[in-house]
Amino acid sequence: MLNETKSILAEKGVDINVFEEIEDAALGNGGLGRLAACFLDSAAGLGLPLHGYGIRYKYGLFKQALENGCQVELPDDWQRFGDPWSLRREDEKREIKFADYTVTAVPYDMPVFGKRINRLRLFQAEGSEQAEKISEYLYPADDTEEGKLLRLRQEYFFSAATIAELLENYVKQHGRNFGTFPKLHVIQLNDTHPVIAIAEFIRLLTAKYRQPFATALSLARQTFAYTNHTVLPEALECWHEDYVKKILPDIADILVKINIYAMREQTAAGCTEEEIAKMAIYNDKTFFMANLAVYVAKSVNGVAKLHTEILKNSLFATAHKIYPE
């Protein structure tokens, strides 16, 4: 294919080496993004229907510069030369509501080519200056309350936009009989950042589509899958209840209710108080997102076989004992 591409470009008077001059967008190259990109590339190459969702950040990691012999970090506007690969879908924008303000999520679609063309959909936050901060920086500082709330807003923003789209599209095609939803969809959670999507899935099913809570939880447990990216307990995401209640009170209520269901189930299974505490989704005024993912997801894995074994035998050993399947 390389030679064919060179030949086609040469016919147009273009040297393929000019592509070496294109700056890479500084949007990160860690394990999370690499695995997501591999998922998308592989699925398109195999002809499988798989679409990705995320945030369309205005700025990347940072732009390095030197001033008086010292490094300074400047915002990296990766879109300064335009973004020819993304298509803005103004017709599919939607509102995402927080307790204190509402944000408009505008999708931008990027094609992923293979045996079929799949889609990477990235949401851009628009509205007030405050709202637009949600999609401004890739990794905002979270050493302050304001920074922590911004991280939480980011996670809910794209998760809520994604779940709302999936459910709306399903209802348009199949009506409000959600029994076949898990047969037609798998929602893959890439680490704990989008795990709040579980609570939003249940919230929409109960509040908007009038499904019983038990039914919504059952559908979630048949739909979601979770890939863990860290074996360090201190790196697993958790949120103090004050933050969640402040901007997402309905989500806080859903999380508490899921925890009650989980505790009842685990008590009936003969778990000790210590085991239940280790698997708690809500405990000591804190929400534990990894425990939520492990309880709800129909499958849990690491990024490698050894990683998965560590999850089974160490990090989530108690949960694996109760839910070995």
Mark where each language-model region is:
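A conserved ligand/cofactor-binding region detector
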Residues: M1-E325
